């Protein structure tokens, strides 16, 4: 069965290539990019042309990214463990990887390297993203993000697929949400922020200990 090549609108192509629509129109007139025309006379850019311009000739030339994240500076040891786990996994599979890491909440979508990763994925420069756990990429909406990556030909590889209990997930989400909004309200380095997050964690630990008695 013949597979039809995908054709992008100028707006879609401009986002992927990081140039303006007018630039694409100039390239078309100058013969720098080969566009096709619809029956209505609209320009469309074949995927092969986008790949040619991006320098992506085939799947093997796309990067494999290892992404690691922790919420706080005090968790740098955990960050390093994630990185070593990802590197070991990649080595076992014979993959060359690039590591991207962030220190910040999983609710914060403005993380520097998270934004960089999204841009790389949208530019179709990433074949795989390796993570230690699903919540390292995002605290909520992981399945949606997974489908988003898939639409750009990027696979998410999860090393540790062990599922947490609903209670464990709820506790982690509660701590993350409180930490996130307390940081917004008081500032990440303020005394009020540290006191509030410490209190919440202590309450959670006490309740957990009671249930195990």
Swiss-Prot record:
The active site is at residue 71. GO terms for biological process: DNA recombination. InterPro entries: DNA-bd_dom_put_sf, HTH_17, IS607_transposase-like, Recombinase/Transposase-rel, Resolv_N, Resolvase-like_N_sf, SinI_DNA-bd, Transpos_IS607. Pfam families: HTH_17, Resolvase. One of its GO terms (molecular function) is DNA binding. Residues 63-213 form the Resolvase/invertase-type recombinase catalytic domain. NCBIfam families: excise, transpos_IS607. This is Uncharacterized protein MJ0014. It comes from Methanocaldococcus jannaschii (strain ATCC 43067 / DSM 2661 / JAL-1 / JCM 10045 / NBRC 100440) (Methanococcus jannaschii).
